[in-house]
């Protein structure tokens, strides 16, 4: 079985290495950066191809000789990548988090009879899978709350935050209206709104605020009340609101000293050195998914907790582990014919397949990514 991983950045590299550990899979990584490809080649028995994903037809040509693909490209390239992979008639598991609605490609995917598993990371991804699983065990699911964040272990003033990707992606989370489900209706709320403090054993108190992370859950799950909130150290949301309301996240150019500049570009340029995760710096991922409902006439609640830390042995960030392993495990199951949903498949459908769900959780556990279930 020949698999091509499209994009070999931080997460794509982890996916490729995990897939390559399976002796039955022949793995190739593709990226526009020779440096990124060489970094993965030094760490795993894979092949490399230079591909410029922005060129029309490049993805279609790249996947033509492979049995399936994995998508790990930047979000702005994600939708076109999916489209070209589907046009080539290949299965794909994707983490690219494209802003467009991937369900628009469902008819094409069904026509081509391919499996297209999208948003298959940690959040979206495992958050949806856990929600889908818990809801499927109930006679009636009434609410779903997803709390998730990636944070540095050491807190450095003023932002107490670190990233491993472009700050523009994070800023987008802070300006895009958050869609939540309230009493069966989709309601838009300001990002960074409704801040609340939440305690996590072993970590302490974090703050949670509204972000637009429900995505496909808003359409696929018949749960009348759903929300997704991002977790940060307390005080972060207020700082971000101050920047946003002052105009630092604005996309309309302003003239300064005779030069026009977009405030958001300047802000990202200034924040990146302060936010960038340093080499070897410890970080962790924390997530809590809570689904409440009724079973046999009684109230029931399923809670899933994850706390995952930087892996010092492999020098792998928690965000790359929790995102990449979910994707690589599901890619392996698709490759082996154990998950065969045709068309565009949001991750919550994985949770509704109890056999696949249990395999996924067990494989994650083997890699040290453990979701603790509590039923009450």
List where the protein language model places each region.
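Conserved N-terminal Rossmann-fold NAD(P)-binding element of oxidoreductases
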Residues: 3-7
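N-terminal Rossmann-fold NAD(P) dinucleotide-binding loop
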Residues: 12-13
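Conserved Rossmann-fold cofactor-binding substructure of NAD(P)-dependent oxidoreductases
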Residues: 52-65
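Beta-loop-alpha module in the N-terminal Rossmann-like domain of NAD(P)-dependent dehydrogenases
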Residues: 68-85, 98-102
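C-terminal catalytic/substrate-binding lobe primarily of soluble NAD(P)-dependent oxidoreductases
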Residues: 137-376
């Amino acid at each position: 079985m020949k698999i091509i991983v499209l994009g070999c950045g931080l997460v794509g590299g982890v996916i490729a290495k995990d897939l390559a550990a399976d002796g039955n899979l022949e793995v190739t990584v593709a990226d526009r950066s020779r440096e990124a490809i060489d970094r993965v080649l030094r760490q795993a028995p894979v092949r490399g191809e230079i591909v410029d994903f922005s060129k029309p037809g490049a993805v279609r040509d790249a996947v033509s000789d492979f049995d399936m693909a994995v998508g790990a490209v930047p979000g702005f390239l994600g939708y076109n990548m999916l489209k070209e992979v589907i046009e080539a008639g290949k299965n794909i598991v994707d983490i690219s988090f494209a802003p467009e609605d991937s369900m628009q490609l469902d008819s094409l995917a069904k026509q081509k009879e391919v499996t297209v598993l999208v948003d298959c990371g940690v959040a979206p991804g495992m958050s949806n899978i856990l929600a889908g699983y818990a809801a499927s065990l109930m006679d009636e699911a009434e609410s779903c709350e997803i709390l998730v964040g990636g944070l540095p272990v050491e807190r450095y003033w003023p932002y107490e935050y670190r990233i491993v990707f472009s700050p523009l992606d994070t800023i987008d989370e802070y300006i895009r209206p958050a869609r939540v489900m309230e009493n069966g209706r989709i309601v838009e709320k300001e990002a960074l709104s409704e801040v609340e403090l939440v305690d996590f054993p072993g970590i302490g108190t974090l703050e949670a605020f509204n972000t637009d992370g429900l995505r496909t859950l808003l359409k696929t799950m018949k749960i009348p009340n759903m929300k997704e909130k991002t977790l940060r150290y307390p005080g972060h949301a207020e700082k971000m609101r101050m920047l946003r309301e002052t105009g630092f996240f604005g996309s309309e150019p302003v003239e300064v000293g005779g030069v026009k500049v977009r405030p958001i570009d300047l802000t990202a340029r200034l924040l990146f050195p302060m936010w960038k995760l340093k080499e070897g710096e410890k970080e962790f991922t924390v997530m809590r998914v809570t689904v409440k409902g009724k079973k046999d006439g009684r109230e029931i609640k399923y809670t899933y907790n994850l706390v995952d830390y930087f892996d010092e042995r492999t020098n792998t960030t928690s965000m790359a582990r929790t995102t990449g392993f979910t994707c690589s495990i599901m890619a392996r199951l698709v490759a082996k014919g154990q998950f065969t949903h045709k068309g565009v498949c949001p991750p919550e459908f994985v949770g509704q397949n109890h056999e696949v769900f249990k395999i996924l959780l067990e494989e994650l556990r083997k890699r040290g990514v453990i979701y603790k279930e509590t039923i009450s």
